[in-house]
């Protein structure tokens, strides 16, 4: 059996870190939403008992470092699946960009193999398994828009934000999430109001959403990589309604309501940044269909 699965990227509209936990993870409170930028995975069932990762992107590992590989391995071991799988990954989401590309690939693998191997797992069960792989995988199983707490694995779904353009700009660097969290000093940062963002989304208040964006990790990444701060400044200057770094970076996104302004910002960033995208907010939840 062969199955094609989409793995959409996410952005953080609001991201706060509340403290460090005894297990070494950080306690977070954040709002994530999916966007119309996606990897495509082709899952092909194999008769041999092996997991194969195929990708033409040299930054995508083809072994157990790959989160899609880990997802397949987890299902095989937990449910004693004897068949193997070939996972062909067509990367569109930039790697190590703060957009959950690897986590979304893992989530898509969980959803797809649940169907191919007739495991009959619910979305909640898949999300619980996803938490064993990575903090963002649970959200990526569902997609849509949600408040994530704990280390990111506790998901509360909220309404979809009003539709708008999202301009993404990624410089030619990768950022280590562990390094960013390691340099975070919680008593020296501005904490965003995540509840205010949730209320604005539930009201369908686009201006309120723009006013409430915030990411406690921004200043840390900006200090480590000043070019990320320069992208934010440039995007603001070209007229984005709101600008924020996603996750631990280095990708910066801008929310834009009007087509003409979107084109101006997009063109103003091309050449200044290695990768620039203009996509739409998705906000739709995944299904098991």
From Swiss-Prot:
Q: Which GO terms describe its molecular function?
A: 4-(cytidine 5'-diphospho)-2-C-methyl-D-erythritol kinase activity; ATP binding
Q: Does ATP-binding show up as a keyword for this record?
A: yes
* Active site per database record: 10, 136
Q: Which GO terms describe its biological process?
A: isopentenyl diphosphate biosynthetic process, methylerythritol 4-phosphate pathway; terpenoid biosynthetic process
Tell me, what's a Pfam family for it? Answer: GHMP_kinases_C
Q: Which residues bind ATP?
A: 94-104
EC no. given is: 2.7.1.148
Q: Which pathway does the protein contribute to? A: Isoprenoid biosynthesis; isopentenyl diphosphate biosynthesis via DXP pathway; isopentenyl diphosphate from 1-deoxy-D-xylulose 5-phosphate: step 3/6
Q: Which UniProt keywords apply?
A: ATP-binding, Isoprene biosynthesis, Kinase, Nucleotide-binding, Transferase
- Which reaction does this enzyme catalyse, per its entry? 4-CDP-2-C-methyl-D-erythritol + ATP = 4-CDP-2-C-methyl-D-erythritol 2-phosphate + ADP + H(+)
Superkingdom of the source species = Bacteria
Similarity annotation: Belongs to the GHMP kinase family. IspE subfamily.
* Function recorded in the entry: Catalyzes the phosphorylation of the position 2 hydroxy group of 4-diphosphocytidyl-2C-methyl-D-erythritol.
Q: What is this protein called?
A: 4-diphosphocytidyl-2-C-methyl-D-erythritol kinase
Per the UniProt entry, what species is this protein from, by scientific name? Bacillus cytotoxicus (strain DSM 22905 / CIP 110041 / 391-98 / NVH 391-98)
């Amino acid at each position: 059996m062969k199955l094609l699965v989409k793995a959409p990227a996410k952005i953080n509209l609001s991201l706060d870190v509340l403290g460090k936990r005894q297990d070494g993870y950080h306690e977070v409170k954040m709002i994530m939403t999916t966007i119309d930028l996606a990897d495509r995975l082709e899952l092909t069932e194999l008769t041999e008992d092996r997991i194969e990762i195929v990708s033409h992107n040299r930054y995508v590992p083809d072994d157990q470092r790959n989160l899609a590989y880990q997802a397949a391995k987890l299902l095989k071991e937990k449910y004693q699946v004897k068949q193997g799988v070939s996972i062909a990954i067509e990367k569109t989401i930039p790697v190590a960009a703060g957009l959950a590309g690897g986590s979304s690939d893992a989530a898509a693998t969980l959803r797809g193999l649940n169907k191919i191997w007739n495991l009959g797992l619910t979305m909640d069960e898949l999300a619980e398994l996803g938490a064993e792989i990575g903090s963002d995988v649970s959200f990526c199983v569902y997609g849509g828009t949600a408040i994530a707490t704990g280390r990111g694995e506790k998901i509360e779904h909220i309404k979809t934000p009003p539709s708008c353009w999202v301009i993404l700009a990624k410089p030619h660097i990768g950022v280590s999430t562990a390094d960013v969290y390691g340099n975070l000093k919680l008593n020296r940062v501005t904490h965003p109001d995540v509840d205010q963002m949730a209320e604005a989304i539930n009201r369908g208040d686009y201006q309120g959403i723009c006013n409430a964006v915030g990411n406690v990790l921004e200043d840390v990444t900006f200090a480590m990589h000043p070019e990320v701060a320069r992208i934010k400044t440039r995007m603001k200057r070209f007229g984005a309604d709101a600008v924020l770094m996603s996750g631990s970076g280095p990708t910066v996104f801008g929310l834009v309501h009007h087509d003409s302004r979107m084109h101006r910002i997009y063109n103003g960033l091309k050449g200044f940044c290695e990768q620039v995208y203009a996509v739409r907010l998705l906000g739709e939840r995944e299904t098991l269909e």
